[in-house]
Regions:
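Non-catalytic alpha-helical scaffolds and adjoining flexible linkers that form interface surfaces
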Residues: 1-19, 25-29, 34-208
């Protein structure tokens, strides 16, 4: 049984020298755990293909529905290189991947969120933006798709316009994004702590 999917690598566990257990967030199967056999030597075109956050094309196979998917073929769709060389971007990347892994059940998928994630990852990779604003943006949208939040009464008009565009068209516009206020971020952080198991943005992110 073969399945072709696109997805993001959100977690990696080294099983042994030549195999890994990957958690992927995919367009067709949602969040899934798969096994990957790693060649001893990767070709130059595949160097870094198993880095966290990579967007990949994958062909999966399994003999029965009870069996874990295994990777038959994998190719790199998008590698967000800047995130691995900028500390703040790396913090955001790890935060996002941790949040998806912790709060999405196995096989949960949402194509609207997948489209948002694609734009969001590109935005982080290419833009120098205040880290708290980027975390706020992810938190808001994450809660929105999970039905945890309907309206924020303390939004000003510009913020409301930005979030309306975000939720209906999945549009990231820097000129609107920059109007997100520190007070709104503070309130969202309070709300967030009562709803989700996110980590603080600090060095502990890399060692837990």
């Amino acid at each position: 049984m073969l399945e072709k999917v696109q997805g993001y690598i959100i977690k990696i566990v080294n099983h042994n020298d030549n195999s890994k257990i990957l958690t992927l967030y995919t367009n067709k199967l949602g969040k899934i755990t798969v096994a990957a056999n790693i060649p001893e030597k990767l070709s130059n075109g595949n160097m870094g293909i198993y880095d966290l956050g990579n967007a990949v094309n994958v062909v999966l196979y399994r003999k029965t529905e009870d069996e874990m998917y295994k990777i038959s073929e994998i190719s790199l769709l998008k590698q967000y290189t800047n995130m691995h060389f900028d500390y703040e971007k790396l913090c955001i990347l790890n935060y996002v991947l941790y949040a998806i892994n912790q709060n999405f059940e196995e096989n949960f998928g949402d194509l609207t969120f997948m489209n948002f994630l694609k734009l969001y990852m590109r935005f982080i990779n290419e833009t120098k933006t205040e880290i708290k604003k980027m975390i706020f943006l992810f938190d808001y949208y994450f809660m929105l798709i999970n039905g945890q939040i309907e309206i924020l009464p303390y939004l000003n008009e510009l913020e409301a316009t930005f979030l309306e565009e975000l939720s209906t068209q999945i549009v990231l516009k820097k000129e609107l994004f920059d109007f997100i206020t520190p007070n709104l971020i503070k309130e969202m952080n309070k709300f967030k702590k009562n709803k989700f198991k996110f980590l603080d943005i600090n060095k502990e992110l890399f060692y837990n």
